[in-house]
Amino acid sequence: MMSLNWGSPSTVMGVVLQLKMNSNRLKVLAAGSNGEFPPFLPKQVEKIKDPFARSLAKRIQRLPVQMDFPDKCIMSSCIKPVIQSKNSPLVLLHCFDSSCLEWRCSYPLLEEAGLEAWAVDILGWGFSDLVENRPPCDVASKRYHLYQFWKSYIKRPMILVGPSLGASVAIDFSVNYPEAVEKLVLINPNAYAEGTRHLAKLPKTIAYAGVSLLKSIPLRLYANAMAFNGISFFTILDWTNVGRLHCMLPWWEDSTVSFMSSGGYNVISQIKQVKHRTLIICGENDQIVSYKLVVQGNLNGRPGPGYSQLPPPAAPGEEAVLARAR
């Protein structure tokens, strides 16, 4: 069965760079942009309290990406880096049914470390404009959209970072467009899931009912509770509202049903075709994707003691782990 994991605030990458953080430094990192929220974001963004989410949300922009429409582009949402580096850029994907806001705690640290990092919303999720121009949101379309984004704006081999289902996106992309990828970083990869399986055969009425359930607060609260321990209810509730913000866009249900009905990602046969150097980070305490599944076959995992599906966010006085694939 396909494992579903919603985005969470502190995805990290491997080869450790430790950064001592005090409360003042955290406030600086969270301050970010002092501007307004982009007008295309759902109005519910105003109610979010997480300073990292608010800061990163103000930086979301839409860039035109040419698809198969001869004279039309998809305005595609992303976080564009302010840093231009000679090193390979990091391109950060997200989990199933999530957005670039998943990287809200890690992204400031990456920038502070001098890395050129793009946080890109996968087609059919995030905050792109799919009201008028919505292609099928199947695997092939998601792959082609990412390639067109890379071709238009990144233009050189990248370090592609994918957590959970994002790892399947990264594997599929690297096999089909090897010239666009230098290395892979996979975090708790959901690489052995066999797509959406029986969900792909559901009648449309039932499929839409199920998708409506996906954005419900109780279900997402439960998913966040599985991923984190020792976090207050009100913090979990705020993170839940961050994670479901993109679900408020009018095209979300159609695009998610399109993905589920297509069969989803099944990259098991592609794993052995991956030729790029790959770093895998996984949590020994993950309750969603088994560590034993991560390290089987052709995948070699680096366990993160105490990690659940994703590590908890950095807090004042603690060490933040920042992954650099070099």
Task: Give the positions of each predicted feature.
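Short alpha-helix in the alpha/beta-hydrolase fold that links the catalytic acid
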Residues: V267, H276, S290-N298
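Catalytic active-site module of serine/aspartate enzymes centered on a nucleophile-bearing elbow/loop
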Residues: S3-L4, S8, Q296-R326
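Flexible "cap/lid" loop of the alpha/beta hydrolase fold
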Residues: I171-L214
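Short beta-strand/loop motif that positions the catalytic acidic residue
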Residues: V274-K275, I280-C282, D286
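N-terminal chloroplast transit peptides
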Residues: M1-S33
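Active-site loop/oxyanion-hole signature of alpha/beta-hydrolase fold enzymes
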Residues: W6, K49-S85, E111-G162, N176-Y177
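Serine-hydrolase catalytic-loop signature spanning alpha/beta hydrolases and amidase-signature enzymes
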Residues: N87, C95-C105, A117
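Hydrophobic, aromatic-rich cap/lid helix
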Residues: T240-V267
